[in-house]
Each structure stands twice: as C-alpha cells, then as structure tokens.
Swiss-Prot record:
Lineage, top ranks: Bacteria, Bacillati, Actinomycetota, Actinomycetes, Mycobacteriales
Boundaries of every OBG-type G domain copy: 1-61
A GO-annotated cellular component: cytoplasm
Family in the record: Belongs to the TRAFAC class OBG-HflX-like GTPase superfamily. OBG GTPase family.
Molecular-function GO terms, alphabetical: GTP binding; hydrolase activity
Main location: cytoplasm
Annotated ranges, domain OCT: 82-162
Keyword DNA repair applies: no
Complex and partners: Monomer.
Name of the protein in question: GTPase Obg
Keyword terms: Cytoplasm, GTP-binding, Hydrolase, Nucleotide-binding
Length: 221
C-alpha cells in the first residue's frame, strides 16, 4: 500500500492574503483531489500544532494495529546426553616408598575417601562399591597388585582386599556389611595413619609419645 501523506502549510502567521490562498489550496486541491489531510500551521508562532500531533498519533496507532503480529521464536533447549565414563578418571602408580604398594590419584576417588567415615562399616562398604564400579579394582589387578597390597588414596593407606577375585562373581552380603572388614588382620584407621607417618619418617616406629611405653608387641598387636 502507498504511504500516507500529510500536507503541512506553514507560516500561517503571514498576511491575510497568504492565509486565504492556503485555504483555497486546502479545500480545492489537496483534500478534495488527493484526499490528503492538510494542516495549516505556524512553526514560529507554534499555532495549530496540537491537531497535527493528534493526527500523527492516530496514524501511528492505526498502523501498529494493522501490522501483522510477529511470532516469537521458540527457544529449544536440547540437554546434552550425560555419558558416564571411567576412563581417565584415576591413575594408578607404584608407590616408590612401599614395595608392592600403589598410589591412586584422581578427583573422584580422592573426594570419596575424604567423605568416608572409616568408623562406619556401611560407609566403608559403600566406598568399596564405588571404587569397584569406577574400575579401580580392575586397574589394580592390571597393575599387578596382589591381595593385601598397600594402596594409598588421598593420603589414606589401606590393605587392598578386592571385592572379587579375577573371573569370580561378586560376593553378596547384607546391607551395611562388608566381608573385607570382618578379617581380623585388617588394621584400624588410626593404625593406617600411624604406619603412613612412620613410612614417611614423620615419627619413630616405637615412639608412642610422652608417658607411653613403646614396644613392638604393642605396635603389632
């Protein structure tokens, strides 16, 4: 459609002859012949400006109503599939200070170790399950670890007792129990910590502190 036109006849403050001529143009030419709205104004004297403003407002509002509504683009969020991967989540290296021992590093196993209450059998069993599912048991086997090998994760050392023997089915036990904890030869968390300190030369093996009698029998049993 053609653009709407408005005719503005300025200088309405001119002599009467000019205003009469403008009235003639308005009636005979623009409005009757072309159908264009005509406004006789005076920009200097600021006369007859309000009718012009109201007409412009009417035109704008009418144009907005006739404008086709734009459809808002739908934002489609496609969540990425979560892939559970174990490769590269931990590393197993020989312990340079313990013969046959291994050190395991990795964000997940180290965090799990710190979150575990080692005085709670169920918590320890849950930790063992998580480490096994992560692939640590298989990794230790491939690294040549034997049952009872000293394994250190996040500064915590323990004797490795695998949940399964290579090629065997897992041993099923009741909730909150772990057959590996029932072995009497397993040392406590405090003993593991002390052994680690002795191994690193932080304390003497037979030093139990002031007013404590040191003996190898006490340490071993």
């Amino acid at each position: 459609p053609s653009a709407l036109r408005l005719v503005l006849l300025n200088k309405a403050d001119a002599p009467e002859a000019l205003k009469s001529f403008a009235e003639v143009l308005k009636v005979r030419l623009f409005e009757k012949q072309f159908g264009w709205p005509v406004f006789i104004i005076s920009a200097v004297a600021r006369k007859a400006l309000d009718p012009l403003k109201y007409k412009l407002l009417e035109i704008v509002q009418d144009a907005r109503k006739k404008r086709p509504k734009e459809k808002a683009e739908s934002v489609i969020i496609k969540p990425k599939a979560v892939v559970h991967r174990t490769k590269g989540q931990f590393q197993i290296k020989p312990d340079p200070e313990v013969q046959g021992g291994f050190i395991i590093t990795g964000e997940k196993p180290e965090r799990w170790i710190l979150q575990t209450d080692f005085e709670n059998d169920e918590a320890v069993g849950y930790l063992a399950d998580r480490l096994s599912k992560l692939g640590i048991e298989d990794g230790l086997r491939k690294a040549g670890a034997h049952v009872g090998a000293n394994v250190t994760i996040g500064g915590i050392s323990f004797e490795w007792e695998p949940m399964t023997t290579a090629g065997d089915d897992p041993i099923l036990t009741g909730r909150g129990t772990d057959v590996r904890l029932e072995q009497t030869s397993r040392i406590s968390a405090a003993e593991r910590k002390r052994a680690s300190q002795v191994r690193r030369g932080l304390i003497d093996e037979l030093d139990y502190g002031e007013d404590q009698e040191a003996s190898r029998e006490r340490w071993e049993g």
